[in-house]
């Protein structure tokens, strides 16, 4: 078993000429821009009872749902529509932490992304209204 020398040499060239650092700077700026777009859109359209946590690092937003809502149920509804969010039980077993959704913001904004976010918002709104 051997390594492809051409690919290995190209990688050495890429890394040794600081192209990687430039790529990372560009990527970080893009991810930050995408995250801000997601944040502002969700902030504008989610029910006021929901909180959005914007942490300075990473490309995820956390949406805190009302305590009555179960993030697993919302996840299951959305996954049936091919929309992926991460419910908090994937990250915590504490009962007090079961009402959060993690949203991946690493995607460039387009009509498909907006339609998916609109469906996330609609699903949360329906659950909030049903819980009142």
Show which residues each predicted segment covers.
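PLP-dependent class I/II
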Residues: 1-132
């Amino acid at each position: 078993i051997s390594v492809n020398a051409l690919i290995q040499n190209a990688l050495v060239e890429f890394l040794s000429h600081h192209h990687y650092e430039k790529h990372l700077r560009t990527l970080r700026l893009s991810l930050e821009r995408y995250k801000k777009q997601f944040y502002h859109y969700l902030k504008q359209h989610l029910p006021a009872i929901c909180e959005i946590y914007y942490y300075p690092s990473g490309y995820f937003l956390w949406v805190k749902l009302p305590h009555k809502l179960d993030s697993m149920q919302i996840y299951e509804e959305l996954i049936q529509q091919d929309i992926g969010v991460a419910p908090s039980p994937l990250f915590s077993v504490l009962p007090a932490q079961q009402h959060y959704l993690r949203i991946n913001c690493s995607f460039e904004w387009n009509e498909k992304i907006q339609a998916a976010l609109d469906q996330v918002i609609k699903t949360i709104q329906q659950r909030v209204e049903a819980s009142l």
